[in-house]
Amino acid sequence: MIKTLVVDDSALMRRAIRDMLESADDIEVIGTAKNGKEAVENTNKLKPEVIVMDVNMPIMDGLAAVKAIMKTTPIPIIMFSSLTKKGSIEALEALRLGAIDFITKPSGLQEISKIENELVTKVRNLYNSNVNIIRLLNLKKFKGEVINGNWNCPDQNLGILIGSSTGGPSSLEQIIPRLPGDLPASVFIVQHMPEGNFCSQLAARLDAISELEVKEAENNEKVKIGVAYIAPGGYHMEIRKALDVTRIKIIKGKPMHAVMPSVDVTVESFVKVYGNNSVAIILTGMGVDGASGFKKINESNGATIACSEDTCVVFGMPKAAIEAGAIDVVKPIFEIPEQIVRMIEVKCNGN
């Protein structure tokens, strides 16, 4: 049984969440808490294996509770987030503090049943995926310098693709800020996120701490060199080239591998545009998204990198790509920025 702690200031919401979780035969709610202070106390006392927690609570809010729990008893935490801009900022802050995932919380109790399947699946996946919280916390401690490159390829069409899921926002903060502002490539980031303001806030955060411009991708916008584009949550991102102009297409299609955006969906078009002038990186995450796509990049003589198991929060996606024979180089996340720059140098300078 997966021992779970439920934290919410509403007694009705706690009961509803408890009922949803315990509808699964492999999940047991071993306790509840009505604020962050009780959550910290019950975590130390009851030793849950997964925590489901709201952000906005009295006495101690969810963000403060995440921070406190990570200091004493780091375990997987799923946060509830609203669809508002404020909610998306809070969700990303929770991820930076050590929470592993979040779920958008319905506005009313009558809507709560709509997230039952997602909630049960996420609790189950976190428990079964060997999530390494210590690695996530260690990511936050490392502060690397910008890696500069030596290149001269003003007319070359170079593309970088990065795929990530669980633990991805913290991993991206170890990569994007260390890429130089004169990088002669366009960067495309596919981070599994739900629809809402989450990816725009992630882009704003990365843009504020990076030399590169980082933005949420918009439909039909022209792709520029030296810009990193993040796929909007809940939509697929494709890259199309016509009459020597490369543009982004944002599509509300069907999920692939149960996710949208999907790395594999983006790769299908990315590899047609960039081919052997591409560098692709698969970071932390559950599942197999990216494995088949990276194989196509590899077969097109593009360069592929996977994050090493010892620096992954969840090794699912990199492991799947490695086992598919789709990866050229496996590197610790702290070495990936330099590896990207060196690979771009080779493709740019023709060495």
UniProtKB/Swiss-Prot annotation:
Location of the CheB-type methylesterase domain: 160-347
PTM section of the record: Phosphorylated by CheA. Phosphorylation of the N-terminal regulatory domain activates the methylesterase activity.
GO terms for cellular component: cytoplasm
Gene Ontology biological process: chemotaxis
Pfam family, one: Response_reg
Compartment annotation: Cytoplasm
Active-site residues, Swiss-Prot/TrEMBL: 165, 192, 289
Keyword list, A-Z: Chemotaxis, Cytoplasm, Hydrolase, Phosphoprotein
Reaction catalyzed: [protein]-L-glutamate 5-O-methyl ester + H2O = L-glutamyl-[protein] + methanol + H(+); L-glutaminyl-[protein] + H2O = L-glutamyl-[protein] + NH4(+)
GO molecular function: phosphorelay response regulator activity; protein-glutamate methylesterase activity; protein-glutamine glutaminase activity
Modification 4-aspartylphosphate, positions: 54
Main location: cytoplasm
EC annotation from Swiss-Prot or TrEMBL: 3.1.1.61, 3.5.1.44
Response regulatory domain segment(s): 3-120
Family from the record: Belongs to the CheB family.
Function (record text): Involved in chemotaxis. Part of a chemotaxis signal transduction system that modulates chemotaxis in response to various stimuli. Catalyzes the demethylation of specific methylglutamate residues introduced into the chemoreceptors (methyl-accepting chemotaxis proteins or MCP) by CheR. Also mediates the irreversible deamidation of specific glutamine residues to glutamic acid.
UniProt remark on domains: Contains a C-terminal catalytic domain, and an N-terminal region which modulates catalytic activity.
Protein's recorded name: Protein-glutamate methylesterase/protein-glutamine glutaminase
Gene assigned in the entry: cheB
